[in-house]
Amino acid sequence: GMDKRYNYTLVNGVKIPSPDDKNRYIPLNIFPSDLMDRLVVSKSLTADMEGDAAGGVVDMVMKDAPSRFQIQANAAIGASDYFWKDGRDYLTSNRSDYTKKSPYEAFGSEYKAQMSDFKNGPVQLKSHSMPSPNFIGGLSIGNRFWNDRLGVMLAGSVQNVFRGTERTYNSVKMASGEQAMYISNLQHRYYSIHDLTAGAHAKIDLTLPGHKLEWYNMYVHTNSKGIRYNNSVNTEYIGADSYTQDDEVRSLSTTQSIFATNLKGTHHLAKDFTIDWSGVFSQAKEEDPDRTYVTLTN
């Protein structure tokens, strides 16, 4: 019953960190389905898991290479009905003129930032009747060598997705000396978001009598650029004729990356004696160097 931000994700029993500072889980769609053997969902911790409080655990078990050469490809194209069906405009900015690093990162803590250090691309907005179609594609190759003892699986995927949404927020107050509540602030927000994700995955397994070694590697890179248009109306007293209307545009660029490598071994030393071990390195990063707000008050 806990919120999804308390869940975390495992690959072959090993936790993968999230680049998002508000969520512990990572999206499952960044993993190619061609590499997945099964999906194990746990709502409570078991004895073989680390003692980490969680709302739920999703473990993706990657399959071994096929017994013979295999190549698979998939592609899909679509569109967001928020723009295509409902006819809303898609907002973009000048993507080639974003600030890649903050002045602090680029020049150090002693540097005094100047206006020229910040690019103008985020405020160069354009409105389109509809975005480009969404595209999702993947390719996987697998084979076995050395009398089927050594297996190799390679996979890559690309997701180019345009999406949009809208939300309404309001704040209420109680008028002095009255029992009536009134809306003091009403905000309507429109979002236009472009997500570009690319991933590469590799798994090598070596099977010997009584022994098995598995080495899994993954790298996923996501670039997200979003425009939020916020229209708000503010008033201080119910029935008052005076009010202010604000139009605010927020433009941001976020880059996330995940790298993980996992070497795992299982050794059956006797009929009732088995040893398993794993060596893991993982790293998740998020960069949000350019976040721009422009507000017009009427």
At which residue positions do the language-model features occur?
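Short acidic/polar hinge/loop motifs at secondary-structure boundaries
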Residues: 14-43, 89-93
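Residue-level detector of the transmembrane beta-barrel scaffold of outer-membrane proteins
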Residues: 10, 38, 70-74, 151-153, ...
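N-terminal periplasmic accessory domains that precede
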Residues: 1, 10, 24-30, 40-41, ...
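Flexible, solvent-exposed coil segments and beta strand-coil junctions
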Residues: 19-20, 36, 113-122, 175-185, ...
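Structural signature of outer-membrane beta-barrel domains
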Residues: 4, 16, 78-82, 159-163, ...
